[in-house]
């Protein structure tokens, strides 16, 4: 009988320990849920539609200076270290051709901390005003870019009308 009593007490103590650990795990999960609730929306890639990006200036690979969004209809942010970026360049150039968006209306910002342009830059220089800047450069900061690739469609006033990770999913641009 004493062995049976000891076994019941041991099982009871083990159940209490398990209950305490479960409460600890639940508390931690609630903390993580609160942290994740405050995280960046995965659909939010930068300046939200309806808002205008901040002021910026960039110098293109051909030496032209682009200041702000005046005259721009599409702005693309690509990265030299992004594995998806080279895959998105052909759909991006097809989007520009399909909607007849001229080179002067498109800015492609390539983020490269070392300043070395990626191989896909050669596909962009004829269809966009392309510039290479650091990841925290003026244009990326003005558009509040949270990841790469990022594509922004702008209206005549320079406000963002749409944004996305995939250029082929972008809506048709408004007439300029």
Which residue ranges define each predicted feature?
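Short, internal strand/loop/helix patches
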Residues: 122-150
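Short active-site neighborhood of thiol/selenol oxidoreductases, capturing the structured segment around
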Residues: 66-92, 108-109
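Structural motif
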Residues: 77-80, 109-114, 134, 156
């Amino acid at each position: 009988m004493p062995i049976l009593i000891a076994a019941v007490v041991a099982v009871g103590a083990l159940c209490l320990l398990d209950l305490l650990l479960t409460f600890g795990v639940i508390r931690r999960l609630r903390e993580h849920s609160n942290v994740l609730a405050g995280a960046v929306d995965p659909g939010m890639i930068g300046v939200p539609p309806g808002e205008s990006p901040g002021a910026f200036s960039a110098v293109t690979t051909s030496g032209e200076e682009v200041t702000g969004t005046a005259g721009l209809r599409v702005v693309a942010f690509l990265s030299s270290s992004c594995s998806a970026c080279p895959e998105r360049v052909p759909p991006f150039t097809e989007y520009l051709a399909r909607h007849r968006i001229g080179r002067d209306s498109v800015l492609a910002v390539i983020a490269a901390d070392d300043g070395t342009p990626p191989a896909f830059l050669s596909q962009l220089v004829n269809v966009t005003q392309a510039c290479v800047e650091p990841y925290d450069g003026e244009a990326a900061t003005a558009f509040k870019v949270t990841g790469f690739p990022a594509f922004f469609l702008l209206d005549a006033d320079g406000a963002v009308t749409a944004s996305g990770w995939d250029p082929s999913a972008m809506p048709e641009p408004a007439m300029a």
